[in-house]
From Swiss-Prot:
Residues 747-767 are annotated as: Disordered. It is found in: Cell junction, Adherens junction; Cell membrane; Endosome; Golgi apparatus, trans-Golgi network. The modification Phosphoserine is found at residues 770, 793, 838, 840, 846. This is Cadherin-1. Residues 155-709 are extracellular. It is a single-pass type I membrane protein. It comes from the Eukaryota. It comes from Pongo abelii.
Length: 882
């Protein structure tokens, strides 16, 4: 080969290498992973919700879920690609084909074909599952990294790694080895992350750091976690990532380690007696935690193991092997013979050849209306008083062979010949008896006896043609004394309110319904609140006993006066009927208009007008328009004007500025019929400005006496009376003439002197303190009869001291008070002493001699006896003989 040939070969090689180096990864193409999918189902009958398989669509956007659609409405495709059965499905052909559609991000439509194959139980193929046990593990390599934001090829998607559950070990066990192409360039270290690696459950999977062997460390449980998603990482010795993380999906394959479980221990159902074969009774349901998509480990089959009782046939019921629906298979169900059946049902997986469990199904045979109710007896009699409703006449007895308290047993009674609806039959829910009662009052005078025909049926119709039982009831009506009946019950009479007293208004009578009795009716008024009416007890004629008044708001409502009239017969017992008399009172012009309000207030400054409404108790035309006029000089200070066209109100305002005070305004009001009246308005002018509603009422102009002034005047009068009384007492005392205590000296000879005071003996230091009592305060009340007492001030006497040491001061002070006491003896009373000593030292009266000389008549010594004898000394001492 020449130099040119070698150069050309080198150039071609260089171009090939350059083309290989510049080649970009294959772009992502949207679409299904496969053009068709084939799924195998274990049986021709599929229940609702059965999972058939899964399709996968790649739309190159990274979305985890896709919207799928199928034209076959029997199947549903979820957003995760899982295909399920929408409703119970039965295969008529060995295969079913249908299309599944999906759309990419540009709304291009893609489709794939799905085929369902059914296989017989005897040659059922089990799905192939690649297990790592006993075979050489697969080698996984990292895909070539791409530059930029480009997706990897679809060929790089790692298929799921299958690992059986419940393996025995030994552990750890190799699953797969992960290799990086960069291990030729240097040392590469491997690690994994994700569920089962570094997130719970942690440590289920591990990877050898240098060799890349992915291992499982313990037995797996598919019922706990069915799929693990891991990410493998490759880094260089200096810690730099040499590969992009690679997703690894580990699927735990199922083992038949769970037996079916019934949703209930005891299932209860019911079926009517006489049900035909094929009638569904109930459904039992069991579940299995094993895989029901890829294996038969959860394919449950139902069977009936036993039936109790086995009569009238040991196979009265059958169960659907796939759905668990129990149905009647044989005729002869009779509630009266066998009311219940107990079935033991079994649920087994692997289509009935695997693990199994049992449950109980209790079937109750319900009653049908195949027995009619029958009267026993068929004839009845009863009595009822007339005019009484809801009265029990008699009780009807029936028997029914059907189940008690069921619609087929409950009786329904019908009266065949009660056209007037006068009777009713109700059913006693406890014993099914019929209770015949009156629906409304009966009239003895109209009919004395009723013969009723009553039929009985059930709540539900008869299942077969049966004869309806009937009974005959004879009802006798008893005559009672009925109350008289007013005709009409409510009588309306129009009368003028000025109807004369004592005149007859109307006649209101009642008739006696008891035509077979001769009775007398007496009338009287039961309610007459205004006491306006009186009635003739024999004829029922009603007349007035007082003047009527339509405007009496207490007794008249809407111009109507209501009175109650009663009529009483003389039967036994006495019966009374009631009638209502409505007197419609027509209006007369008997009320003059009046103002409202009658008390008003104005402000002194800038007063605002006040509106006065005109009220008339009469009715039109005896009311508005009204005429208003100020009288008795009120128009000098005030003015009025009408407030509305109908003249039903006026406006009052002052003509000029008025002084603060109270004013009386005479206002004359006249109605449309010239009925007038003068009313006095109380008007107050307040010390305010503007609206009078914000000011207080002014003080009255006239001076008046208030309570404090009255009390002051009374106090002054009382003080004046006391002063006059004291003055009179003082003048009376001045007018008293002093009379000598002793007769003149000429008449004193040979006479015995009488003294008012009898001394208590000589002074003695020995005295009894207990006799002092309370001092002079305890002196007796002895009143003089010869001299009228005068009103004088009394000196103050000290009370007896508790300390005996102070008794001397007590005596001295009270002696001084007694000396200055004008009421002291001898002018007021005789002194009374409780203790006068144990004897008298005075000489006998016979030793007293009459004095005959002037010396003996010397009374100057009386001046030495103190103040107590001063008056006596003044009268007898120092005097000259005339």
């Amino acid at each position: 080969m020449g130099p040119w040939s070698r150069s050309l070969s080198a150039l071609l090689l260089l171009l090939q290498v350059s083309s290989w180096l510049c080649q970009e990864p294959e772009p992502c193409h949207p679409g299904f992973d496969a053009e068709s999918y084939t799924f195998t189902v274990p049986r021709r009958h599929l229940e609702r919700g059965r999972v058939l398989g899964r399709v996968n669509f790649e739309d190159c956007t990274g979305r985890q879920r896709t919207a799928y659609f199928s034209l076959d409405t029997r199947f549903k495709v979820g957003t995760d690609g899982v295909i399920t059965v929408k409703r119970p499905l039965r295969f008529h052909n060995p295969q079913i084909h249908f299309l599944v559609y999906a759309w990419d991000s540009t709304y291009r439509k893609f489709s794939t074909k799905v085929t369902l194959n059914t296989v017989g139980h005897h040659h059922r193929p089990l799905p192939h599952q690649a297990s790592v046990s006993g075979i050489q593990a697969e080698l996984l390599t990292f895909p070539n990294s791409s530059s930029g934001l480009r997706r990897r090829k679809r060929d790089w998607v790692i298929p799921p790694i299958s690992c059986p559950e419940n393996e025995k070990g030994p552990f750890p066990k190799n699953l797969v080895q992960i290799k990086s192409n960069k291990d030729k360039e240097g040392k590469v270290f491997y690690s994994i992350t994700g569920q089962g690696a570094d997130t719970p459950p942690v440590g289920v999977f591990i990877i050898e750091r240098e060799t890349g062997w992915l291992k499982v460390t313990e037995p797996l449980d598919r019922e706990r976690i069915a799929t693990y998603t891991l990410f493998s990482h490759a880094v260089s010795s200096n810690g730099n990532a040499v590969e992009d993380p690679m997703e690894i999906l580990i699927t735990v394959t199922d083992q038949n380690d769970n037996k079916p479980e019934f949703t209930q221990e005891v299932f209860k159902g019911s079926v009517m007696e006489g049900a035909l074969p094929g009638t569904s009774v109930m459904e039992v349901t069991a579940t299995d935690a094993d895989d029901d998509v890829n294996t038969y480990n959860a394919a449950i089959a139902y069977t009936i193991l036993s039936q109790d009782p086995e009569l009238p046939d040991k196979n009265m019921f059958t169960i659907n092997r796939n759905t668990g629906v129990i149905s009647v298979v044989t005729t002869g169900l009779d509630r009266e013979s066998f009311p219940t059946y107990t079935l033991v049902v079994q649920a087994a997986d692997l289509q009935g050849e695997g693990l199994s469990t049992t449950a109980t199904a209790v079937i109750t045979v319900t009653d049908t209306n195949d027995n009619p109710p029958v009267f026993n007896p068929t004839t009845y009699k009863g009595q009822v008083p007339e005019d009484e409703a809801n009265v029990v006449i008699t009780t009807l007895k029936v028997t029914d062979a059907d189940a008690p308290s069921t619609p087929a047993w409950e009786a329904v009674y019908t009266i065949l010949n009660d056209n007037g609806g006068q009777f009713v039959v109700t059913t006693n829910p406890v014993n099914n008896d019929g209770i015949l009662k009156t629906a409304k009052g009966l009239d003895f005078e109209a009919k004395q006896q009723y013969i009723l025909h009553v039929a009985v049926t059930n709540v539900v119709p008869f299942e077969v043609s049966l004869t309806t039982s009937t009974a005959t009831v004879t009802v006798d009506v008893l005559d009672v004394n009925e109350a008289p009946i007013f005709v009409p019950p409510e009588k309306r009479v129009e009368v003028s309110e000025d109807f004369g007293v004592g005149q007859e208004i109307t006649s209101y009578t009642a008739w006696e319904p008891d035509t077979f009795m001769e009775q007398k009716i007496t009338y009287r008024i039961w309610r007459d609140t205004a006491n306006w009416l009186e009635i003739n007890p024999d004829t029922g004629a009603i007349s007035t006993r007082a003047e009527l008044d339509r405007e009496d708001v207490e007794h008249v409502k809407n111009s109507t006066y209501t009175a109650l009239i009663i009529a009483t017969d003389n039967g036994s017992p006495v019966a009374t009927g009631t009638g209502t008399l409505l007197l419609i009172l027509s209006d007369v012009n008997d009320n003059a208009p009046i103002p409202e309000p009658r008390t008003l207030f104005f402000c002194e400054r800038n007063p605002k007008p006040q509106v006065i409404n005109i009220i008339d108790a009469d009715l039109p035309p005896n009311t508005s328009p009204f005429t208003a006029e100020l009288t008795h000089g009120a128009s000098a200070n005030w003015t009025i004007q009408y407030n509305d066209p109908t003249q039903e109100s006026i406006i009052l305002k002052p003509k000029m500025a008025l002084e603060v005070g109270d004013y009386k305004i005479n206002l004359k009001l006249m109605d449309n019929q010239n009925k007038d009246q003068v009313t006095t308005l109380e008007v107050g002018v307040c010390d305010c400005e503007g609206v009078a509603g914000v000011c207080k009422k002014a003080q009255p102009i006239e001076a008046g006496l208030q309570i404090p002034a009255i009390l002051g005047i009374l106090g002054g009068i009382l003080a004046l009376l006391i002063l006059i009384l004291l003055l009179l007492l003082f003048l009376r005392r001045r007018a008293v003439v002093k009379e000598p205590l002793l007769p003149p000296e000429d008449d004193t000879r040979d006479n015995v002197y009488y003294y008012d005071e009898e001394g208590g003996g000589e002074e003695d230091q020995d005295f009894d303190l207990s006799q002092l009592h309370r001092g002079l305060d305890a002196r007796p009340e002895v009143t003089r009869n010869d001299v009228a007492p005068t009103l004088m001030s009394v000196p103050r006497y000290l009370p007896r001291p508790a300390n005996p040491v102070e008794i001397g001061n007590f005596i001295d002070e009270n002696l001084k008070a007694a000396d200055t006491d004008p009421t002291a003896p001898p002018y007021d009373s005789l002194l009374v002493f409780d203790y006068e000593g144990s004897g008298s030292e005075a000489a006998s009266l016979s030793s007293l001699n009459s004095s005959e000389s002037d010396k003996d008549q010397d009374y100057d010594y009386l001046n030495e006896w103190g103040n107590r004898f001063k008056k006596l000394a003044d009268m007898y001492g120092g005097g000259e003989d005339d």
